[in-house]
């Protein structure tokens, strides 16, 4: 398997989605890591309120996928925020029912 060289949050697919979407991300190997890094992936609504945490654990370098089920949430814009060490990135997602 190929080990990612950079931290990356891919755009969710499909987008817009109803009710499920797939979120893929890369956890790189870093010189300062002891083999695993804590990764946090959370979903926020358009007002910036956290609605769920999809990932909050130490992960080995590699590519991962998680699913977000928007069944209980209203249509609208949501943000997927991934943090890894000192880095963070955000993608916009649209739930369209």
Please name every model-derived segment.
Residues 59-63:
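Beta-propeller and related beta-repeat scaffolds in trafficking/envelope systems
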